[in-house]
Amino acid sequence: MDLKFTVSGRIAKSVDVVYEAVADPAQLSKYFTTGGAKGRIETGATVTWDFHDFPGAFPVRILAVEKNRRIELRWGAAPGTADADESGEPSTKVTLEFEQLDDGRTLVKISEEGWAQRPEGLAASYKNCEGWTGMLCAMKAWLEYGVQFRQGFYK
């Protein structure tokens, strides 16, 4: 059985507003990357996400983008927790999907896969599942109400 997960949530904004809140580093830094994001999400780019509550900045490789529909990325994982990518480093693949709903809201789905089939991979997948769920909640609070609540949430 592959270790992977999908989380989802609905945000009361149009798909272009929600997509841009992820693709634009200035917006992403308002509710998710507490240490800042550098680089716009575009196919082939490597951007940087930094979190005050986790050590160091993370390089994030953008594999594919379909504006207002999908973002596919790969980022590093701790040794022993994920399968190796083409460079030989442990990493997982994340897919964010955006769907405009008939009532004007946007459904966002986030899936992550590539975890190693061992206890360390399972534990790491649970932590990231928690993190992506928190990201969706923080994005909803930011876009719908202008509230930033991630700062200090994890540490």
Model-derived segments and spans:
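Short, solvent-exposed secondary-structure boundary/capping segments
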Residues: 69-77
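Short beta-edge strand/loop motif at the mouth of beta-sheet-based domains
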Residues: 6-7, 17, 26-61, 68-70, ...
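Residue-level recognition of conserved beta-strand positions in structured domain cores
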Residues: 51, 75, 110-112
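Short, highly charged C-terminal tails/helix-capping segments
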Residues: 141-155
